[in-house]
């Protein structure tokens, strides 16, 4: 009964995470109209860190064993996570969309759960079960039905090849961040992984902004209140609260189990557009939403309970 309750908690947390992540779509659109990519992500990560650091300090007070000497190995791990896990899905994604399209990015992002599952097998030795393959297919089909407008507007012509390739690399970076974070969570707390990877990401964004952008990150005058509100939403909700919950669930279940939940993101993006701008919803989109939820529930509820049952049986 306890395991079943835990599985439902994981499922509810993943639903909430994707709902908070969906808020980044309108927020990035508003902020991106005024701020360049590296500057935007620098301030987003900084605001998220302002939220996380007090929680981490409180954690250190409660758990004395969390504090440890910062060795070269630790620095190297967070440098790797920040450069290859934070910069690609933030700066590179924005750069790729500018040279491709948002519709192409939405379609190419469907590869992230598949990439996560594959990296989980290669990097962490996770098993590729039939349930995981079935859930991935279920979520993929559901997301394609939800994203019918993106499919109709997508274009993969040769002129957009570079942008599409960079978007794909951004998706790989996102998958790497989640998978490598799972490995680091065996040695560090959720807040440590987030804060130190964000610090590396901020440093990289600051360097990119100062070197290549027309208005460096430290020139903050001239941005509207709407821009700063959007950045605040991104920092506190999408990269703050949502990522804490995501890391908490990632520490409880395998990468392969959590991957399909990312297919909920387009569903909540659609729901938010219906609520805010009164977009019309179609029957295929309703069916797609149901399939996406079913795919996530299958992994977080059914496989988690099945794994726990097998573990319990093996211990007798």
PLM regions with names:
Residues 1-42, 156-183, 203-207, 311-316:
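Glycine-/small-residue-enriched transmembrane alpha-helix faces in small-molecule transporters
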Residues 9-13, 39-58, 80, 135-141, ...:
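Hydrophobic alpha-helical transmembrane segments of multi-pass integral membrane proteins
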Residues 20, 24-25, 53-109, 145, ...:
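Specific transmembrane alpha-helical segments of multi-pass solute transporters/efflux pumps
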Residues 22, 26, 82-87, 91, ...:
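Hydrophobic/small/kink-forming positions within alpha-helical transmembrane segments
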Residues 26-34, 65-66, 98, 147-160, ...:
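Membrane-interface helix termini and inter-helical loops of multi-pass transporters
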Residues 31, 40, 44, 96, ...:
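Hydrophobic/aromatic residues within transmembrane alpha-helices
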Residues 41-43, 86, 90, 102-111, ...:
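Helix-helix packing/entry segments at the starts of transmembrane helices
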Residues 52, 119, 128-150, 205, ...:
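Hydrophobic transmembrane alpha-helices of multi-pass small-molecule transport proteins
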């Amino acid at each position: 009964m306890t395991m079943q309750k835990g599985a439902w908690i994981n499922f509810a947390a993943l639903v909430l995470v994707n709902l908070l992540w969906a808020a980044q779509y309108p927020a990035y659109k508003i902020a991106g109209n005024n701020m360049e990519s590296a500057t935007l992500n620098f301030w987003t990560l900084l605001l998220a860190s302002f939220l996380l650091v007090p929680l981490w300090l409180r954690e250190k007070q409660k758990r004395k064993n969390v504090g440890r000497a910062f060795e070269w190995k630790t620095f190297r791990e967070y440098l790797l996570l920040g450069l290859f896990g934070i910069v690609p899905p933030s700066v590179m994604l924005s750069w790729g969309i500018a040279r491709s399209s948002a519709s192409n990015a939405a379609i190419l992002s469907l590869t992230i759960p598949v990439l996560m599952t594959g990296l989980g097998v290669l990097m962490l030795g996770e098993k590729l079960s039939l349930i995981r393959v079935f859930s991935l297919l279920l979520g993929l089909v559901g997301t394609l039905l939800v994203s019918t407008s993106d499919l109709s507007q997508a274009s993969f012509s040769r002129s957009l090849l570079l942008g599409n390739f960079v978007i794909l690399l951004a998706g790989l970076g996102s998958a790497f961040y989640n998978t490598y974070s799972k490995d680091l969570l065996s040695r560090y707390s959720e807040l440590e992984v987030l804060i130190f990877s964000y610090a590396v990401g901020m440093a990289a964004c600051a360097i990119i902004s100062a070197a290549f952008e027309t208005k460096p990150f430290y020139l903050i005058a001239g941005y509207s209140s709407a821009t700063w509100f959007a950045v605040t939403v991104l920092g506190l909700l999408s990269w703050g609260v949502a990522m804490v919950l995501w890391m908490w669930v990632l520490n409880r279940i395998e990468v392969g189990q959590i991957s399909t939940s990312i297919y909920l993101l387009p569903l909540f993006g659609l729901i938010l557009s219906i609520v805010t701008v009164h977009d019309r919803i179609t029957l295929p989109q309703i069916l797609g939403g149901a399939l996406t939820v079913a795919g996530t529930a299958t992994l977080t509820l059914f496989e988690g309970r099945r794994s726990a049952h097998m573990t319990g049986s093996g211990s007798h």
